Amino acid sequence: MRALLLDIGNTRIKWGLADGAKLQRTGTVTHEKIRDAGIAALTTRLPRRVDRILACNVAGTSLATRISGVMHLHCDTDTHFVHPARAGFGITNGYGRPRRLGVDRWVAMIGAYAEFSRALCVVDAGTAVTIDALDRQGQHLGGQIIPGLRMMQDALTSETDGIEVDIPRSRARPA
């Protein structure tokens, strides 16, 4: 089964084409590029024939709705959005209200636990940095969200006097 996997983040959309359990191709496009060049900045890189589209979205419902519509036209397939659950894929959600856990954190833990099947500290560094702990049984023990490198750099330089940040802007972008 060919599946198109979409990670709709706050800064970028990352995608991967999976054939069974194997990732065949990947790509990324920034929201800025889509604003400047149009949605073709994403679709020209994507396959047209897939059996399923799975998406993880933290960028809001407006963009999710737009991407879902475009994917339906491009691939003639509905987009299925992942949501955190009480348990799934070997992970037990540590939140009393499972959907309060960010879906990006949920899928990062699922992927890490599927790969390593042991106690883990899962770190995802993007626009924000998320850190989550899993025990060896896959129980989510809790986590933290902190600003990403660019947000921290911007806060320091705009809210303080006399601090010079010597990280080039091009290196301060999320992966």
State where each predicted segment sits.
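Active-site rim beta-loop-alpha module in soluble metabolic enzymes
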Residues: 139, 146-175
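Fold-independent oxyanion-binding glycine-rich loops
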Residues: 8, 57-58, 83-85, 104, ...
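N-terminal glycine/serine-rich phosphate-binding loop of ATP-dependent small-molecule kinases
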Residues: 1-4, 8-87
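Conserved active-site and cofactor/substrate-binding residues in soluble primary-metabolism enzymes
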Residues: 34, 62, 100-107, 151
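A short alpha->loop->secondary-structure connector
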Residues: 72-75, 139-143
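Conserved phosphate-binding catalytic cores of ATP/NTP-utilizing and phosphoryl-transfer enzymes
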Residues: 87-120
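Gly/Thr-rich phosphate-binding beta-strand-loop-beta motif of the actin/hexokinase/Hsp70
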Residues: 1-24, 112, 118-140, 156
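Acidic-glycine-rich active-site phosphate/pyrophosphate-binding loop
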Residues: 77-90, 127, 161-172
